[in-house]
């Protein structure tokens, strides 16, 4: 009898250690197109667009999988996998992502893949973990829909850099306001016929007057940040190059005093990195955040890549590297995949094929 009691105690002890701390033993798998699942996915999309410092906003394309874990003493943890698509709105553009156009296949679309964990507490979602990567569509797939469409070019290609600088000079020459400096080359394509370079880039306003500025080095960025987004084409002609440029200047952004991590205000170069290089470490010391930290405090952002090497787009993996946020449910990295008990959503008996709950619908197109 004593042996039986001891065996039962050991079994209970093993069960306690095998479950993730702070999470229940049973998870549920709602439908990927349920309103609650989509709400969680849209919070994840907002998180990407609010924290990705370079390139373009992303929009939700498909929800691949979702698991919901009960969390002790309250709340639920949503583990969700989503596919995203790049839009034509830059991350500095204040336009809501719902009003941004998705970049089409013939324009050389970019797809993102993300794993998120979101804590739902008192009806509100907050991100506690984010890991993403993104990549342009293959050249073969672009050629299938448009044989002559140009592909993405490396952002530091000499022709691209020359086109961006020439376009900025042309914009400043016809601008009666502040002188603008080049902030980031965001996207570029080399067009074979007619020979031309298409480039998109961002600019930032300075305290110099455009018509009077002679040395950019003597100009300082405005205290209230003012950014603009430009599209330009530099065409090669017999008589020389011809530049066509249009810029949209966004409203100034007031300075807000917020606590910053150590080294956050240091000047960093325009991020263009080698895709084969290892990812930069995240800001702050590696390791797990302390328990009891504010749920809206995050340490997910990576240090900006600093090497100007061949790179055609700003990969999400350099920003969302899978570091646990300070708002993690237990203050540590959770691993809910260890527990395999699952509760499927109830489905009544009905004639016809059973539709799997996941993956969900494709909102735009598959890359």
Curated annotation (Swiss-Prot):
What the record says about family reads:
Belongs to the fetuin family.
What positions belong to the pro-peptide in this record?
301-340
Q: Where in the cell is it found?
A: Secreted
Please give the PROSITE patterns that the UniProt record associates with this protein: CYSTATIN_FETUIN_A, FETUIN_1, FETUIN_2
Function comment: Promotes endocytosis, possesses opsonic properties and influences the mineral phase of bone. Shows affinity for calcium and barium ions.
Gene Ontology molecular functions: cysteine-type endopeptidase inhibitor activity; endopeptidase inhibitor activity
- GO CC annotations, alphabetized: extracellular matrix; extracellular region; extracellular space
Q: Where, per the database record, does this protein carry Phosphoserine?
A: 134-135, 138, 325, 328, 330
- What is the protein name for this chain? Alpha-2-HS-glycoprotein
- What span is annotated as the signal peptide, if there is one? 1-18
Where in the numbering of this chain does the Cystatin fetuin-A-type domain appear? 27-133, 144-255
Please give the subunit comment from the record.
Alpha-2-HS glycoprotein derives from this precursor, when the connecting peptide is cleaved off. The two chains A and B are held together by a single disulfide bond.
Post-translational modification, briefly? Answer: Phosphorylated by FAM20C in the extracellular medium.
What are the cysteine partners in each disulfide bond? 32-358, 89-100, 114-132, 146-149, 208-219, 230-247
Does Signal show up as a keyword for this record? yes
Glycosylation, residue list: 156, 176, 265, 339
Higher taxonomy: Eukaryota, Metazoa, Chordata, Craniata, Vertebrata
List, in alphabetical order, the GO biological process terms annotated in this UniProt record: acute-phase response; negative regulation of bone mineralization; positive regulation of phagocytosis; regulation of inflammatory response
Report keywords, A-Z.
Disulfide bond, Glycoprotein, Mineral balance, Phosphoprotein, Repeat, Secreted, Signal
Q: Which InterPro entries match?
A: Cystatin_dom, Cystatin_Fetuin_A, Cystatin_sf, Kininogen_Fetuin_HRG, Prot_inh_fetuin_CS
Positions bearing Phosphothreonine? 319
Spans annotated as Disordered: 254-301
């Amino acid at each position: 009898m004593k042996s039986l009691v001891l065996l039962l105690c050991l079994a209970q002890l093993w069960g306690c250690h095998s479950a993730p701390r702070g999470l229940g033993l049973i998870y549920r798998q709602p439908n990927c197109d349920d309103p609650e699942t989509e709400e969680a996915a849209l919070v994840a999309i907002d998180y990407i667009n609010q924290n990705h410092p370079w390139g373009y906003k992303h929009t939700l394309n498909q929800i691949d999988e979702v698991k919901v874990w009960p969390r002790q003493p309250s709340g639920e943890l949503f583990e969700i996998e989503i596919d995203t698509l790049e839009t034509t709105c830059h991350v500095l553009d204040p336009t809501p992502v719902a009003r941004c156009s998705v970049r089409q296949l013939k324009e050389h679309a970019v797809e993102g893949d993300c794993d998120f964990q979101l804590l739902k507490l008192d009806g509100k979602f907050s991100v506690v973990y984010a890991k993403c990567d993104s990549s342009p569509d293959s050249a073969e797939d672009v050629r299938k829909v448009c044989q002559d469409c140009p592909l993405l070019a490396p952002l530091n290609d000499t022709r691209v850099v020359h086109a961006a600088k020439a376009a900025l000079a042309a914009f400043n020459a016809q601008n009666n306001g502040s002188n603008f400096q080049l902030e980031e080359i965001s996207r570029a394509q080399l067009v074979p016929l007619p020979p031309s370079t298409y480039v998109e880039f961002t600019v930032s306003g300075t305290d110099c007057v455009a018509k009077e500025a002679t040395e950019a080095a003597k100009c300082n960025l405005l205290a209230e940040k003012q950014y603009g987004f430009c599209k330009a084409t530099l065409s090669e002609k017999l008589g020389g190059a011809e530049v066509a440029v249009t810029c949209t200047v966004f409203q100034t952004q007031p300075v807000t005093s917020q606590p910053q991590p150590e080294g956050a205000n240091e000047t960093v170069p325009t991020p263009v990195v080698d895709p084969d290089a290892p990812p930069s470490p995240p800001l702050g010391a590696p390791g797990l955040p302390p328990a009891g930290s504010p749920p809206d405090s995050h340490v997910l952002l990576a240090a900006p890549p600093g090497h100007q090497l061949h790179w055609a787009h700003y990969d999400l993996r350099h920003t969302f590297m899978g570091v646990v946020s300070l708002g993690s449910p237990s203050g540590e990295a959770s691993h809910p995949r260890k527990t395999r008990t699952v509760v499927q959503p109830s489905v009544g008996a009905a004639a016809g094929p059973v539709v799997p709950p996941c993956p969900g619908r494709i909102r735009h197109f598959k890359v």
